[in-house]
Amino acid sequence: MFDNKNILITGGTGSFGVEFVKKTLANFKPKKLIVFSRDEMKQWEMAKNYPNHAALRFFIGDVREKERLYRAMSGVDFVVHAAATKIV
């Protein structure tokens, strides 16, 4: 399903996002898997965990920033929306 496809996951560094990336890279061969999130540090940590995955890309942004989100979605085949505001 995701082989040779461009996938964008919003909230990609959250709990669901981390698991989605892990399972997708283990079970499919996406052309691009774009992790979209606001947290630069979590993106950096995630990148260290996947040093040999050329398909994995990172995009800093907030889903409330329409233009930034549209830019991230350019050429994307699938969007997995997992972004949320955490209120603790």
Residue ranges with predicted function:
Residues 1-4, 15, 55, 64:
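Catalytic, metal-anchored helix/loop core of enzyme active sites in primary metabolism
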Residues 5-27:
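N-terminal Rossmann NAD(P)H-binding glycine-rich loop of SDR-like oxidoreductase domains
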Residues 8, 34, 59:
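Conserved Rossmann-like nucleotide-binding pocket used by diverse enzymes
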Residues 10, 36, 79-83:
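SDR active-site strand-loop-helix element
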Residues 25-42:
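Conserved glycine-rich Rossmann-like NAD(P)H-binding loop of the short-chain dehydrogenase/reductase
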